[in-house]
Amino acid sequence: MLIPRKVKHRKQHHPRQRGIASGGTSVNFGDYGIQALEHAYVTNRQIESARIAINRHIKRGGKVWINIFPDRPLTKKPAETRMGSGKGSPEWWVANVKPGRVLFELSYPNEAIARAALTRAIHKLPIKARIITREEQF
């Protein structure tokens, strides 16, 4: 699982999700990429599930890059707890994804298999996304 080794503060505020991604919007390492089309918090489990889906489909001969990292903790209070008495304990680690951000990159010689693998990964993610290539970037 992807989690930070050490953080300065255990709990953070939840900012509003607005704006578009300013960096990380192009395919730099691989030939194909998954680009987000909307705002979302992507958890470390969803990132890992998408990575496994890609690797199982391409088997061997390709390389996968993960361009996001879950560095923000989300907290949750236990079930059937009264209001008040502070903020809940950290439950998940999430990556704050903005529209335009490239989440995964893939290098693979066969385009049809690469697109099928990335489509499987998109189904594991909680956002609308599209597949882009190194040539067709906006």
Curated annotation (Swiss-Prot):
Molecular-function GO terms, alphabetical: rRNA binding; structural constituent of ribosome; tRNA binding
On the tree of life, the source organism's domain of life is Bacteria
What does the function comment of this entry state? Binds 23S rRNA and is also seen to make contacts with the A and possibly P site tRNAs.
Q: Where is this region: Disordered?
A: 1-24
Which GO annotations describe the biological process of this protein?
A: translation
Q: How does it assemble?
A: Part of the 50S ribosomal subunit.
Q: Name one GO cellular component term.
A: cytosolic large ribosomal subunit
Q: Which PANTHER family match?
A: 50S/60S RIBOSOMAL PROTEIN L16, LARGE RIBOSOMAL SUBUNIT PROTEIN UL16M
Q: What is this protein called?
A: Large ribosomal subunit protein uL16
The UniProt entry's sequence similarity note says: Belongs to the universal ribosomal protein uL16 family.
The residue ranges flagged as biased composition, category Basic residues, are: 1-17
